[in-house]
Amino acid sequence: MITNERIVSYLHSLEKGNGDFLDNLRVYAEANNVPIIRKEMESFLKVMIDLRKPSSILEIGTAIGYSSIFMAMSSEETCHITTIENYDKRIPVAKGNFVKAGMDERITLMEGDALDKLKELVDNKAKFDMVFIDAAKSWYMEYLMEVFKLTEPGALIISDNVLQEGELSESRYAIERRNRTIHGKMREFLYNIKNMENLDTTIIPLGDGVAMSWRKQ
C-alpha cells in the first residue's frame, strides 16, 4: 500500500459496486488469495475506457477473469477483449466466469506464456487500441516491446503495480535479496517509458502504482 489506508477506505466507501456477479467474484478472489485489480484501479480503468472508447483491448494477465469482465462491462458492446494467462489452475476458472457473466463471446482467452502469445499476435498482425499489463512484473519491458508492434499511435497502454508497495523508491541494498531482480527491472521499465520519444507517460501513486502511457508515434 503506497497511499494512506484511511483515505483508501474512504474512497472505497464512495464506490457503488459493479453488480452482484463482479462483487461476489471479488469476495471469492480475496478469500482465495487471487490477485485482482484494486477498487481504485477499477475506477481509473473505467474512466480511461470511457475516454478512449477502444474497439479492442489486450490484457496481459487474466487470473480468474475479473478485470477482463470488468473491462468488457465498462466498454461498448462492440469492443472485444483478448486476454493472456499461463497459470493452468486459473484458466478454467476464468473461462467459467466469462460464461457466467455472459461475456464469453466478447472475451478471447489465450493460454500460455505471455511473451510467446504476444509474438503469436504480432505474427497474426493483430492490433489493439488499449493494452492493460498486469502480469509478471520482471517482464514488463519485454512485453512492452511486443505491445509496440500491436498498437498504433493513439493507443493507450496501462501498466499496473509498478511501484511494488513503494519499494521502488528504496535503494536496491535496502531490498531483500530475493526481490532485487524485479526491483531493478521495474526501475528500468519506468525509466524507459518516461524517456521514450514515442510515449507520453505519467506514473500515478494509485493502488500499487499505475503507469499510463499514450503512444504518440
Give the location of each predicted region:
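A short alpha-helical cap/connector motif
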Residues: 1-130, 137-158, 162-217
